[in-house]
Amino acid sequence: MSVTMREMLEAGCHFGHQTRFWNPKMAPFIFGHRNKIHIINLEKTLPMFQDAMKYVRQLAANRGTILFVGTKRQSREILAEEAGRAGMPYVDARWLGGMLTNFKTVKTSIKRLKDMEAAKEAGALETMSKKEALMFEREMIKLEKSIGGIKEMGGVPDAIFVVDVGYHKIAVTEANKLGIPVIGVVDTNHSPEGIDYVIPGNDDSSKAVALYVRGVADAILEGRANAVQEVVEAARGDDEFVEVQEG
């Protein structure tokens, strides 16, 4: 589903931060200011958003993995929901340093979480003392909260999608270090540097955040559907080809 300028306006994507907090590197994307608030130029945002979604579609069509990152209160819920709908990993609690650059260690924690889930399923809690069971549950809840969204991520992702690049500076730095492309919502108070696909826009309004996140999830599902369609059509084309024997 394509997003329109009207939808962006209605979601308040154009409202930036107070002018005194601005980052001059965002000047090319700023339309002006009203009541000491910077107004983002949506005529720049819309094509840049579309460009990012085109990249997301292509990546999804090639079975790529996109890690959704949004740990702020107003983005957590919708981000986890939409990443789940698109079948992609996500980080909605705190970003743990080394989540990308030290994925080996993170993998150990993922294995621990999966083992604990399997043990619980097999009824291991019934053989534990009350105290042991409580400690077990606590550890499992803690692990689920911090890495539950990435437990099916087999390795580092092919790209990351970040809502508020300043708030998630560590995630962006880790991705840059590993050469992982970054799709990022950048507000007027942050720098677009290090972001491969910049989406200049409001990163605080829950309506605006929902618009970006749904857009990315839709693009992933479209990319996958297009890839399946191409395979079906290619197979159909092969069936229709009949070799004629000569003589």
Curated annotation (Swiss-Prot):
This protein's GO CC annotations: cytosolic small ribosomal subunit
Any GO molecular function: structural constituent of ribosome
GO terms under biological process: translation
InterPro entries membership: Ribosomal_uS2 (IPR001865), Ribosomal_uS2_bac/mit/plastid (IPR005706), Ribosomal_uS2_flav_dom_sf (IPR023591)
CDD domains with a match to the protein in the record: RPS2
UniProt KW Ribosomal protein keyword: yes
Pfam families assigned to the protein according to its UniProt record, in alphabetical order: Ribosomal_S2 (PF00318)
Key words, A-Z: Ribonucleoprotein, Ribosomal protein
Record-stated family: Belongs to the universal ribosomal protein uS2 family.
Matches recorded under PANTHER family: 30S RIBOSOMAL PROTEIN S2 PROKARYOTIC AND ORGANELLAR, SMALL RIBOSOMAL SUBUNIT PROTEIN US2M
Name used for this protein in its record: Small ribosomal subunit protein uS2
Species this chain originates from: Cupriavidus taiwanensis (strain DSM 17343 / BCRC 17206 / CCUG 44338 / CIP 107171 / LMG 19424 / R1) (Ralstonia taiwanensis (strain LMG 19424))
Gene responsible for this protein: rpsB
